[in-house]
């Protein structure tokens, strides 16, 4: 009889678009989209906070566009489903405060020379270090625990908005624990160990109805059957009651869900949030190009799993450091992969913005602000496009 394989449990969580922190991310990115749509050179650092009956937008924005911030706030909240005080916020009647100033002239001269620098000369908008990660355990080259938690959240919103589960309200959280096997550095998912869903609901529905609907309409369509077995544990609204939600239940802030936005606890994170930031902010553009690099390494067959780190100094275009680790799964040494990465990718912020087409607004950034920035199949997510990496397979 074969010896039992050594496995471990790893958990990732997600929140859906009605969670107050995620609502703030979406408002900040809706503002960014509006600024870039009118003026692609807009410099945006937009934060949002919310509590009962209140949304405040604040930060530094320099744009030639004429942007109606209050209108954007109300429309974004309305689209999420916050249309009455009962569900957590009334988009049409809540108080909206706007405190927006221009970008500091000190930062402007150092980063883009008050818009006089050529793209290749534009410096990083701040110091910091960013990570990109990829793994061959899913078609998206993303961690399964994160993919499932994220898709459960997206599905919750889908069945709320299409009327399948009319008792649902906008706020909700999901969490998935996966049992993994470590195959010499590569991650191999064996099964789903635990599924947790806590979703806001109306007064009329019973806990039994909630559990039955979540299993049938949310879990079943999202989690492949091969990962579920008789031992899988389900915690469905384990607190017993979740009627009060959204900003009425909890305060919300932009940039408080950075692990949900990225890799669900896998890889690493430099700490900088994404939403509300234009592409000169390397917290965002640096993390996007690092994901493209890591994904390209795995997709090109150079490694089964990979992390890429880059770092910057404010006002300096070239990264200070680039680091690659393939967790022992590389087909050639990591130092050789690093050389290929440096030859293939341009990590200067102005060039990232051009090569990934990051100066385009519309609803591009709003889409990123819920259900993850990575692993999405959407042409606007340009950093998900694999760059083929040329390498010589070592002789066997």
Curated annotation (Swiss-Prot):
Pathway: Amino-acid biosynthesis; S-adenosyl-L-methionine biosynthesis; S-adenosyl-L-methionine from L-methionine: step 1/1. One of its GO terms (molecular function) is methionine adenosyltransferase activity. Binds 2 divalent ions per subunit. The metal ions interact primarily with the substrate. Can utilize magnesium, manganese or cobalt (in vitro). GO terms for cellular component: cytoplasm. The keyword Ribosomal protein does not apply. The keyword Nucleotide-binding applies. Its cofactor is Mn(2+); Mg(2+); Co(2+); K(+). Gene3D superfamilies: 3.30.300.10. Belongs to the AdoMet synthase family. This is S-adenosylmethionine synthase 1. It comes from Beta vulgaris.
């Amino acid at each position: 009889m074969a010896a039992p394989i050594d496995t471990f449990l790893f958990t990732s969580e997600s929140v859906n678009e009605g969670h107050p922190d995620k609502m703030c991310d979406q408002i900040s990115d809706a503002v960014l989209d509006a600024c870039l749509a009118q003026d692609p050179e807009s410099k945006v650092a937009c934060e949002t906070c919310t509590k009962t009956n209140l949304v405040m937008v604040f930060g530094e924005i320099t744009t030639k566009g004429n942007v109606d911030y209050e209108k954007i706030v109300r429309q974004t909240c309305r689209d999420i489903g916050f249309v009455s005080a009962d569900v957590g916020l009334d988009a049409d009647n809540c108080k909206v405060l706007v405190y927006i100033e221009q970008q500091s002239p000190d930062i402007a001269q150092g980063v883009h020379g008050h818009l006089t620098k050529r793209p290749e000369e534009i410096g990083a908008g701040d110091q910091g270090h960013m990570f990109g990660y990829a793994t061959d355990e899913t078609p998206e080259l993303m961690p399964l625990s994160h993919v499932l938690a994220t898709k459960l959240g997206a599905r919750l919103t889908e069945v709320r908005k299409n009327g399948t589960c009319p008792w649902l309200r906008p706020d909700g959280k999901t969490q998935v624990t996966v049992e993994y096997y470590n195959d010499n550095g590569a991650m191999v998912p064996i099964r789903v160990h635990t599924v947790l869903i806590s979703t806001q609901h109306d007064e009329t529905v019973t806990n039994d109805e909630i559990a039955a609907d979540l299993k049938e309409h949310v879990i079943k369509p999202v989690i492949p059957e091969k990962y579920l077995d008789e031992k899988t544990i389900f915690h469905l609204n384990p607190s017993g009651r979740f009627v009060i939600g959204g900003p009425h239940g909890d305060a919300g802030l932009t940039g408080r869900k950075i692990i949900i936005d990225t890799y669900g606890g896998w890889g690493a994170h430099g700490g900088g949030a994404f939403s509300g930031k234009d592409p000169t902010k390397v917290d965002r553009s640096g993390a996007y190009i690092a994901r493209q690099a890591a994904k390209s390494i795995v997709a090109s067959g150079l490694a089964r799993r990979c992390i890429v780190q880059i770092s910057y100094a404010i006002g300096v275009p070239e990264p200070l450091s680039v680091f690659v680790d393939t967790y022992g799964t590389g087909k050639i040494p990591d130092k050789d992969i690093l050389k290929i990465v440096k030859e293939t990718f341009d990590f200067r912020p102005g060039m990232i913005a051009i090569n990934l087409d990051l100066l385009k607004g519309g609803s591009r950034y709003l889409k990123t602000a819920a259900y993850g920035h990575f692993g999405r199949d959407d042409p606007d997510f340009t950093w998900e496009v694999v760059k083929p990496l040329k390498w010589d397979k070592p002789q066997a």
